[in-house]
Amino acid sequence: MKKILMILALLALAVGQSLADDASAKDSDSKGKTITVQGILVDTSCYFEEGQKGDDHDGMKACGKDCLNSGVPAGVLVDDKVYILIFPAKAFADVAGQTVEIKGDAYGDNLINPKKAFVIDKNGKKPIKLTGFEMM
């Protein structure tokens, strides 16, 4: 539990620093540029701590889903880079470990505020509902 809290604190610091860097940049576009990424949806705690990419890991069924439902930030793993989603993680809990496509505003090097999200499977793209989630 202490490790998870430490990781969350470090992520919060990284988000704050990145947003501060963006705010002080000379670029007048305060929203950031729009990007689209496609990769594996991970819970950042288990990924950064142990490299876990799926929903079921370390002998725990639905660990990724549980972590995201508890507020651990969601990320999209693209090659060796993780884009952290600036959005309530609960919106992505049901697709932990699956391939997703996220389109949104980029901040810094690895933060995305999603505007559209899709889960991708053998049948194509299905939208992920991004409404009805409150930021704390």
Predicted regions and their residues:
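N-terminal export/membrane-targeting signals
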Residues: 1-21
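OB-fold and OB-like single-stranded nucleic-acid-recognition modules
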Residues: 19-136
